[in-house]
Amino acid sequence: MLLYTTNPVQQDAFIQAAVGKGYKVVKLETMVDAAFINNVEMKWEGVQFVRVDADVVDNLIDKQENVDSVLSKDEVEQAKKLFEFQIPETTITVEVKGLSQDAAPVIATRPEFMRRMKDMASMGGGGMTAFYAQMPDEVNLTINGNHAIFQALLKEPDIDKQQKQARNLADLALLSQGLLKGAELTNFINRSVDLLK
């Protein structure tokens, strides 16, 4: 398993998390690199490239380490409901995992296969890649059930404030992936200002 980055600036948080766990991340930033990745994976058995932002770092390389979430089953369900919302042209899947306490509270990732297909379509690939270009973005929102912020958020008595804070956490994660644009970005900015009042 080889971790790589296509944009070290945009993917810096994911790179830092991987390096913090002792992994190395290679830079593959050009269009030639995308073809190289596919070619190597087809020709060399057992070699797999995974973009550093394809999943939370604890899931990228399976080391059979399971960290349990400190949230109860009811709190997990409550957290999932707080993060269920719609964004145009985006399919969002929400999951709660027990990650490191110092990991981000919410992490947005895009599945490796769909991201690759969309990347190839954006480079002018025909056939099935054109089909994938028309599909909505898929985003996994991983809620870090061990982050201290959720102990306070789930106990917040003001429901409106609780929902705004949850949405801001999700929007920060989406923003880190460059997936917050247009009206959604404007709403995030306005909501952030409102929460600071």
Where are these regions (language model features)?
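Long, intrinsically disordered, charge-dense linkers/tails
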Residues: 1-197
